[in-house]
Amino acid sequence: MALLTLKVNGREVSRDVPPATLLVEFIRETLRLTGTHVGCDTAQCGACTVHLDGKAVKSCNTLALQAHGAEVTTIEGLAAADGTLHPMQAAFRACHGLQCGFCTPGMVMSAVDLVKNHGCHNETQVREALEGNICRCTGYHNIVKAVQQGAAAMAK
């Protein structure tokens, strides 16, 4: 066991974890934050995307101990304390950028990273940036529309 100390959604957390614990396991099983999903377990689908020190990472191939001393934001940490949705979350809802919802947390986290860290907004850039996120239900049209609307709202 090793002591892991980090901030998750603004809250300081310290737990003993086995060295091989994946970040997604720590988030879901230890902290019970189940918005981050496990889809493929091979970093291909993007359902497990979280922010590690402000950058999108796939938590299914990141060891929890790699996040020691870092700040992790999950989908639960995007909304305001009063429950007001983050502009990107609101855009996904408004544009119907989801169907079953399984991929949505990872899509939203990737989209927020795209806008904050890369400033990409046109359709081609959005589609390229979301290549690491798979949705098995939609044709991506509404997802791209949601990202563009969310980006515009985040710019205000």
Give the location of each predicted region:
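Signature of N-terminal electron-transfer/Fe-S-associated modules in redox systems
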Residues: M1-K156
